[in-house]
Each structure stands twice: as C-alpha cells, then as structure tokens.
C-alpha cells in the first residue's frame, strides 16, 4: 500500500520532524480512513510525537470513526494534561462503557474518582469496587474523602473527630494499615470516649456521608 511504501521510505527518518508535516498534509484526505488514522496514531506514539496538536486531531478522528476503550482513554489523558478536566472525565466515562475487562474498568473508575471529591469520589470508588473488590485504591480514595470532611460532618468536636474512625475502618478494608493508623490517631482517645459518655453508642453523620459509626466500648 501507499502507507507501507511511505513507511519504508521514511525508515529511520520517521521522526517527528518528518512525520508531522507528512501527516498534516495527508490528514484531511484520510480523516475518515480508520487504517490510515490507526497507523498514523501508532507511528506518532512510537516516535513520541504525542505532544503535537496533530496527534490529538488524529486520535479524535480515529475515536469518531471507530470508538474504543483505548482511544477514549487516550483522549481522556490528553485532555487531562491540557487541563480540560470536564472533557477528560467525559472520555474516561466513555472508556469505562466501552471497556470489557473488569480490572481495566476498575482502574479507569479510580482515575475518574481521583478527579472528584467527597460524595462523587466515593460513588466512583464504590463503582470501581464492583468490578474489582480488591482494588485498594478505591478504599484509599473513600477513606480520604471521609477524613477530609471531618469538620463538616459532626455537630460537636467529638462527632467531628469520630469521622476518622470511619476513615480508618474504610482504609482497613483495603488492607491499608498504616493509613488506618494515621486516621485512628486523629480520632477521639479513650479519655475522650470516657468523658463523652458515648461508649457503645451510635453516631450518625448527617452530612453527605450519611453513615453511622459505633463508638468503641471502654
């Protein structure tokens, strides 16, 4: 094919300096040609020409012609790097929907979760766990979301600090012992529990968390 003879002719000269003008010239005529777009994207990726705006155009066209989990993910990463967070999340979500491998779905959902905070971060992390129940990153994100909301989730200083018990419990579910210990250290002490008179009682967090924790018995 013409594409193969061009590749052969370029040979070792197929670097960004040569590829970009060549693909720029041929892009318009091939913007709906899946084979050409795939080859061009692959070659530009191999030669590390991915920072050029042409690469984004080629991958976007390829995604429009033949959407795949990989092209959607790639566009998500590129929009991320460009600071277009909302667009990146849109492509990551599309990638999740197109992906058939549950472990990859879970990893993608973690990437989306890390772009959010609080309730949205937890929702995406929980979705990630539904595809891979042993994804410790999901528990890390959830624990962090709870801990970062301590100040807004209790009506007393004791209740606010009790949120750290929930964060620690969540971290432990993911086998994150050192993180759990850090949150435990921020939670009420045994003296605090004794003085509160709440030992063995339930505390419900009436903020976005909407969960309860049982205060440890002394």
Which residues fall in each region the model found?
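Preference for long, solvent-exposed alpha-helical segments and helix-linker "stalks"
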Residues: 1-54, 65, 177-218
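Alpha-solenoid helical repeat scaffolds
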Residues: 24, 56-60, 93, 126, ...
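TPR/TPR-like (Sel1-like) alpha-helical repeat modules
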Residues: 1, 126-134, 147, 159-188
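Residue-level recognition of tetratricopeptide repeat
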Residues: 33, 68, 102-105, 134-136, ...
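Structural marker of alpha-solenoid helical repeat scaffolds
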Residues: 64-65, 98, 131
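Short coil/turn linking the two alpha-helices of tandem helical-hairpin repeats
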Residues: 45-49, 81-83, 103, 113-120, ...
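Structural register within alpha-helical repeat arrays
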Residues: 39-44, 75, 108-112, 142, ...
């Amino acid at each position: 094919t013409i594409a193969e003879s061009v590749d052969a002719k370029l040979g070792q000269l197929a670097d960004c300096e040569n590829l970009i003008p060549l693909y720029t010239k041929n892009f318009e005529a091939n913007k709906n040609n899946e084979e050409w777009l795939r080859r061009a994207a692959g070659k530009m990726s191999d030669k590390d020409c991915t920072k050029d705006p042409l690469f984004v155009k080629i991958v976007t066209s390829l995604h429009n012609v033949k959407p795949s989990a990989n092209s959607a993910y790639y566009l998500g990463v590129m929009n991320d790097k460009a600071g277009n967070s909302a667009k990146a999340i849109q492509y990551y979500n599309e990638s999740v929907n197109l992906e058939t491998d549950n472990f990859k779905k879970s990893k993608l959902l973690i990437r989306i979760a890390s772009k959010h905070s609080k309730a949205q971060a937890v929702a995406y992390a929980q979705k990630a766990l539904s595809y891979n129940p042993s994804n410790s990153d999901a528990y890390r994100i959830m624990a962090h979301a709870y801990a970062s909301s301590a100040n807004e989730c209790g009506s007393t200083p004791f209740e606010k600090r009790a949120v750290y018990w929930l964060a620690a419990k969540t971290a432990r579910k993911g086998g994150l012992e050192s993180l759990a210990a850090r949150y435990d250290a921020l939670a009420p002490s045994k003296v605090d529990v004794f003085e509160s008179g709440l030992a063995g009682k339930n505390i419900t967090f009436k903020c976005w968390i909407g969960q309860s924790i049982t205060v440890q018995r002394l």
